[in-house]
Amino acid sequence: MTLSSHVIGSGSPATFLHGFTQTSHSWLELVEHLPLASTLVDAPGHGESADGQRSLTQIGDDIAAIMPTGCLVGYSMGARMALHTALQHPHKVTSLVLISATAGIRDADERSARKNSDDTLANHIEDVGVTTFIDEWLSQPLFAGLNSATNQRQDRLRNTSRGLADSLRFAGTGTQEPLWDQLRDLTMPVLLLCGTTDTKFHSVALEMA
């Protein structure tokens, strides 16, 4: 699958992967201020990359096929995709930035429960439609500090209910095989980031480091 992408700016190459319900446009306000040639990618099931029926392994190949050799940056869902890309195609990734990342759920029962939860949410998205779901999604405490100018609601509404649902079914956290034992195989510099109040991913980042 050829993912939709576009390049902003000039300079050293860097590729950016957004989180669930976002699109490549979510990075615009940031990358416009960076001295980089930034490749902004629509993940499968998001934006102009409408087909969400891609596994994380397939997505790693898809990203490597379109990105220039350089830095790879991913947030949340995009961080999991970036990690797969770096492990599968290390020659394409000179440095790796993972924001709110995880290397997967180790426990098989917990992973299965998360897969069931992701599937239930996917069905719900298709039942209620993208507008209702995005409003539900943005009402979570995680986004409490955002307002209409910063929550990117209009951009998120560019997605489709089918695309988001398939993204969860095929590449949700519950589908990810644990990559903890493979972290030692990363040969490029890696930067792990999380929000100052994000205690969950702060703990995960410390464990991944």
Regions found by a protein language model. Name each.
Residues 3-50:
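Conserved HGGG/HGGXW glycine-rich cap/lid loop of the alpha/beta-hydrolase fold
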Residues 29, 84-88:
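Active-site signature of alpha/beta-hydrolase-fold catalytic machinery across serine-
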Residues 57-71:
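Conserved acidic catalytic loop of the alpha/beta-hydrolase fold
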Residues 72-74, 99:
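Short beta-strand immediately N-terminal to the catalytic nucleophile in serine-hydrolase-like folds
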Residues 74-78, 82:
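Gly/Ala-rich beta-loop-alpha elbow adjacent to hydrolase catalytic centers
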Residues 87, 94-125:
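Flexible "cap/lid" loop of the alpha/beta hydrolase fold
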Residues 119-125, 136-147, 167-174, 193:
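Helix-loop "lid/cap" segments that line or gate small-molecule binding pockets
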Residues 159-207:
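Conserved serine/cysteine hydrolase catalytic core
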